[in-house]
Amino acid sequence: MDHIRNFSIIAHIDHGKSTLADRLIQFTGISDERTFKDQMLDNMDIERERGITIKSQAITLPYQAKDGKTYSLNLIDTPGHVDFSYEVSRALASCEGVLLLIDAAQGVQAQTVANLYLAMEHNLEIIPVINKIDLPSADVERVIEQIDDELGLDSEGHLKCSAKAGIGIQDILEAIVKRVPPPRGNPEAPLAALIFDAHYDPFRGTIIHCRIMEGTVKSGDTIRFMSNSATYRVEEVGHFLLQREKRNCLSAGEVGYIIAGVKTVSDVRTGDTITLDDRPCSQPLPGFREVKPVVFASIYPIASDDYDDLKAALEKYQLNDASFIYQKDSSAALGQGFRCGFLGLLHLEVVQERLEREYDQSIILSVPSVRYRFTLKDGSVVYVDNPAHYPGSSSIELSEEPYIRATLMLPERYLGAVMKLCMEKRGVNSTLNYPSPGRVELLYEMPLAEVIYDFYDRFKSVTQGYGSFDYELIDYRESQLVLLDILVNGERVDALSQIVHRDRARARGLQACERLKEEIPRQMFKIAIQGAIGGEIISRTTITPFRKDVIAKCYGGDISRKRKLLEKQKKGKKRMKMIGQVSIPQSAFLSVLKSDAD
């Protein structure tokens, strides 16, 4: 076990994590020029295109150090975006050390700090690495000061590198060997293995990614998942090189995979402990919490016949994404679908895109919402994340919404614009710090519902991309919440209902009405589109009808003839309006649902 090192790379989004992983893979020689491609560990197209890492990946790098010994370095690559911090915490629980990567030009960012605290919670050895030192705008001295002052780490032990140019890679590998402690654990003890990820293979079933903490597992063993006591027989174990590499056994300290013919996707829970059925460990491994979704939205198939296909796609998708939850839902306007929970807006976008690409689904997403808390007059407390379950306003004693504490780091010149944006989003209790000259750290408490709409995009645009943002949920606070309904031709469209703050209701209602007006085709009769709270109409637009020229055939003559024809047309239109159903096209739903996220 002395020759094993388990480490992870943590950084703010875009600080060069995946590029550094590529260089480490190249340097250790497991990838030649022919098989190499950028972002080796980002397997999904969407990860490559957006340049982000979404899923944790593991790979074993054989490295011959300067002391002449060969070490097995297990790299667990982690995502950097705020929505995926649960993936980071899972990966960190499987490691003994981390490389804390900091961009030499941008310096310490909000997510750097958040991930550092996660690493400290797990008591890991932290090696600060300053990346992109070859950039013209790199300011290494300033970053060293930030490591000392803002992060409270000893900057003496920092390393400098340029992952893109391949500078300083060997120093990093040597530092991992020297400074990251070897894993502890007893290969003879009862098996305890931590699941940090899993993915679905149509031929082999579920492939479990795990770190063996204690004991040994080999093919032929019968394993048990401790959270649900499901048992399976192990078919194959091994390490991840660029592909899966079969081994006879995995023992304490190693990172690898287990294939055990697990077909029921829901049995494999990320963060669960695997043990042997005939010789179980006494208690599960600590440190994992149930991941709680933060943003909720409904997903419907565009064609109602595709419901079963969508259900199968969600089941398979959920295996690769432990934090995604869903349950059945139905809507009068859109038919059968699913109510889903996500970690944040980027997570929601990624799920939507992966369902469309990898599983070939055509779907509609409803307006995203958060989980509100209502205390009713009879004293009971209900949590509502779906506007369809909104309790009647007459029965509500107290309505509350979730608040977050946002940490914003930005150059000082954008301070005014960012404070204005936060105030607009109902931000309160601001704290202002100056961690270093020219840089500001802002702390705000604000409603999560305001953040999930367009806060991130607007924050990025007012800071011209130089700001960074991180948040954590704090508590529920009293708020004036109302249910905004959209009526088309007097009929309530349930898929467009949303729970909003009373001050925002009129603007939201008007925005939805205007969007629908652009998308719904004109009919032969007038269509009213209204936004309503309870019985009160707060916004309205009208789609004017087509008009057939019924008096075209009358030349001159008596006006009463024309009047008679016009009256007849008016009666016909009235009758048409009473029985005429307005069909709302899919594009109209998408337009309204997108309007809040744009």
From Swiss-Prot:
Biological process terms in GO annotation: positive regulation of translation
Enzyme class: hydrolase
Function: Required for accurate and efficient protein synthesis under certain stress conditions. May act as a fidelity factor of the translation reaction, by catalyzing a one-codon backward translocation of tRNAs on improperly translocated ribosomes. Back-translocation proceeds from a post-translocation (POST) complex to a pre-translocation (PRE) complex, thus giving elongation factor G a second chance to translocate the tRNAs correctly. Binds to ribosomes in a GTP-dependent manner.
Protein name as it appears in the record: Elongation factor 4
Reactions accelerated catalytically: GTP + H2O = GDP + phosphate + H(+)
Keyword set, alphabetical order: Cell inner membrane, Cell membrane, GTP-binding, Hydrolase, Membrane, Nucleotide-binding, Protein biosynthesis
Native organism: Syntrophus aciditrophicus (strain SB)
SUPFAM superfamilies according to UniProt: EF-G C-terminal domain-like, P-loop containing nucleoside triphosphate hydrolases
Membrane topology, record value: Peripheral membrane protein
